[in-house]
Amino acid sequence: MAVSLWQQCIGRLQDELSAQQFSMWIRPLQAEMDGETLVLYAPNRFVLDWVRDKYLNTINQFFTEQMGSDAPKLRFDIGSRPASKPAAPAASTKSPVAPAAKSPSKPSFNSNEPAATANHRSNMNPTYQFDNFVEGKSNQLGKAAALQVSENPGGAYNPLFLYGGTGLGKTHLLHAVGNGIIKNNPNAKVVYMHSERFVQDMVKALQNNAIEEFKRYYRSVDALFIDDIQFFANKDRSQEEFFHTFNALLEGNHQVILTSDRYPKEIDGVEDRLKSRFGWGLTVAIEPPELETRVAILMRKAQESGINLPDEVAFFIAKRLRSNVRELEGALNRVIANANFTGRPITIDFVREALRDLLALQEKLVTIDNIQKTVAEYYKIKMADMLSKRRSRSVARPRQMAMALSKELTNQSLPEIGDAFGGRDHTTVLHACRKIAQLREESHDIKEDYANLIRTLSS
């Protein structure tokens, strides 16, 4: 009875949550009765803690509404019940799911598979591991999903689609997943490549009349990771071959991970049937790192290089370079090289001198005025509305977005930002920043708008 009601509870959660939230947190759960207690199994500690913190009250409320005082007790555990089935229903009204043949409970990596698997030499970069991936709010979900895939390839998150701007850590996560899979099963055939390599291989196969060998190779892998899938755009034959390869891999419970610089539905020149399949599993945004994460990245990189980086220097760099991890690491490498060549200590003045061209470019590009104009154009409102007292949502929300971006992308104080928005109080700016942060958690559209504007302003 309780397990049956759990399926109904899943239906309610699916209606209330976004497709990404449902796929990320609810779909992987498995339910089993233990006496009078309903046990919900989560695949890892991260999912368990998140569900218990965010959704426990909703779940308890549903059971109380349905069963009153007879509602079962709830307990959370890590793992899976024997011969389990996924907690979520086989079909979803919010987003399509993979064919029924794809069962997350069946491992697709078998050490007894053909010799071709065992003889395959992995092209995973061993330096990219989960341990040296700096986690923050901007990439927390992406790392959690990638970690789950490495522990249970071919499971609930298949395919996994990671999207975000250049240099944010998508490739790092791909290699970390591959290294994790191979660590658990050295015989696994895991292939990583850029999308252009797939196209090149297919062209060579056509030229050499070896298209059947091409198909056999790509459909025999245990996991296929393709970076920058957007480069398939307008390559019709490549899309056709990848479509059939994708279907074959998922039907065989083999893991697929794809990355792109944009949300799947926004990739122009890619067939709708492929975009639809990209959303079968889980789609996660990797956003530019927030200040605390940028500082942590710099401190970790300096530590790995054997350099003592003062906290105030790390904050100085992190506050001024915001677009991506690659830019941060490149700037730090330049600082370290200059310090080694000159023998000078790394201070704020030294960093200001070593990075003067880079810092000057950043300060020139991102101003509050530039942010206001960009946001106004994005939301199709008048620039004057940014400074007006109008409170309609069509104006207030873009204004709040511009305030939040001003705090994130400039070095101006809250009072200075308020002055630039028609003389508003600093508490108004603080409220706007908190409101946008909340909406980014709750609304996919706001999250997308924020990421798109960050990319535009940082490019």
From Swiss-Prot:
InterPro entries documented for this protein: AAA+_ATPase, Chromosome_initiator_DnaA, Chromosome_initiator_DnaA-like, Chromosome_initiator_DnaA_CS, DnaA_C, DnaA_dom, DnaA_N_dom, DnaA_N_sf
Positions of region (Domain I, interacts with DnaA modulators): 1-90
GO CC annotation: cytoplasm; plasma membrane
Nucleotide-binding in keyword set: yes
Region annotation (Disordered) ranges: 75-124
Region Domain IV, binds dsDNA, annotated ranges: 340-459
Transmembrane segments: none
Subcellular localization(s) per the UniProt record: Cytoplasm
Start-end of Polar residues biased regions: 109-124
Biased composition (Low complexity): 80-108
CDD domains: AAA (cd00009), Bac_DnaA_C (cd06571)
Function, in words: Plays an essential role in the initiation and regulation of chromosomal replication. ATP-DnaA binds to the origin of replication (oriC) to initiate formation of the DNA replication initiation complex once per cell cycle. Binds the DnaA box (a 9 base pair repeat at the origin) and separates the double-stranded (ds)DNA. Forms a right-handed helical filament on oriC DNA; dsDNA binds to the exterior of the filament while single-stranded (ss)DNA is stabiized in the filament's interior.
PANTHER family: CHROMOSOMAL REPLICATION INITIATOR PROTEIN DNAA
Similarity field: Belongs to the DnaA family.
UniProt-recorded name of the protein: Chromosomal replication initiator protein DnaA
